[in-house]
Amino acid sequence: MDWSTHEKDSMDAIEFASGWRAVFAEAGLATVDDFMRYEGGTPIGHNRHRQVLTFVLDTPGGPRRFYMKRFIRPHLKDMLATLRRFRRPCSQAECEWRYARTLLAQGIETYHPVCHGSLMRYGFEQGSFFVTEEIQGQCLTDYIAETWKNLSAEDRRMLLVSLGRFVRRVHEAGISFPDLYAWHIYLLDPVGPSSPLALIDLHRMRCGVKRLGERLRNLGALEYSLLERYFDDDAKRILFEAYRRPEDRLSWEDFRSRVLRRADVLRQRRRHAPDY
């Protein structure tokens, strides 16, 4: 998408969380076009369909770091998925904005949304962006890679139980999270085995889901992302036993079989195995 060919939208086309509009206007970010063409900051990830960058702006409280996800070539299947979920055209950025607010309303931590905007044509998304505040914490996989070998057995157990109970709380809120990979989970400051946890990368999240099969598919994604160099069978049993609910009426063997089956599907689909 060549954003230079589009007329600038009015500032009202962008939805801001309270208190942020003037901060971004001062930095020259006032329209959808401004955000989509912004070249400041540091890119931290991209593929054919989206880009992620981080940048710092001056605010009344001092410099603040933000993250922006830009959906530059929205995938048709994702546009159709949001249409089914919301029963109206909805950009990928608005979808993630709404899901972040839903999680926070349920008491489940995630990045705090700042603003979003989109360019729609005939009900189809041409591109969109979503800006969040920086999460004060550390990605779970980074924490594991740096500290796992030095954690005591009790601290490891504490972290595993916390993780299992966190995922159970997400599911008990009726939320399905297909991308429940360890790298989409954060430990909040002060970082440690008992830290509160948070989710990121929300655009495939779904609400109002209670089906056991879908919850087990989520857990299969988590299983896939747990590297054997850190998580042996005993560690995984601690985690998943902390998650399990008596009302699901599944034996441990049936539960593990279904989770592992989904993890195997993901391994076959991925070109590269996870590493951290």
Please tell me what each predicted stretch does.
Residues 180-190:
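Hydrophobic residue at the +6 position relative to the catalytic HRD Asp in the kinase catalytic loop
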Residues 30-141, 168, 172-173, 276:
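Conserved ATP-binding subdomain of kinase catalytic cores across diverse folds
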Residues 136, 182, 204:
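Short, glycine/acidic-enriched loop or turn micro-motifs at the edges of active sites
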Residues 1-43:
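Juxta-kinase regulatory segment immediately upstream of eukaryotic protein kinase catalytic domains
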Residues 194-272:
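C-lobe/activation-segment region of protein kinase-like
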Residues 140-150:
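AlphaC helix of the protein kinase catalytic domain
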Residues 172-182:
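Catalytic-loop of the protein kinase fold
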